[in-house]
C-alpha cells in the first residue's frame, strides 16, 4: 500500500530533559518542534487510506515489513537545478519519526518489524516519487 503525506518532514533526534522547579520530576521533550505535526500528518494519511488505523487490535502487518520512503524537502532558493538535498535533516532521523508514526497509526506492531528499507531525500520535481510540495511518499509491503 502507498501513503502520500503532505507537510514538512521533521527529524526525530535527541530529546531534552529538564527538571520542573519545586518538584523532583524530570520532563523529556523533543528537540524539534516540528516532530509532532509531522508524525500527526503521517498518522492521518494512514488513517484516511485505511480505516484500521490507530486501533491496537487491527495491526496491518503482523510479520516482516518492507518500507520504501521518499521525502520531498523544500528547495532552497540558492539550490541549483540539479542539486540534491545534502543538508540537514539527516535521512535516518527523518525515518525515525516516520517509522514511529507508522507504528502509532497501526501499520505494524513495532518498527523492529522493518526488515528492508529504501529511503531518499529529493526536491520537488526531482524524480518519480517527488511531490510538488514538501511531504513523503511511503510504500509499505507486508512480507
Label the predicted regions.
Residues 1-143:
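Acidic, proline/glycine-enriched N-terminal capping motif
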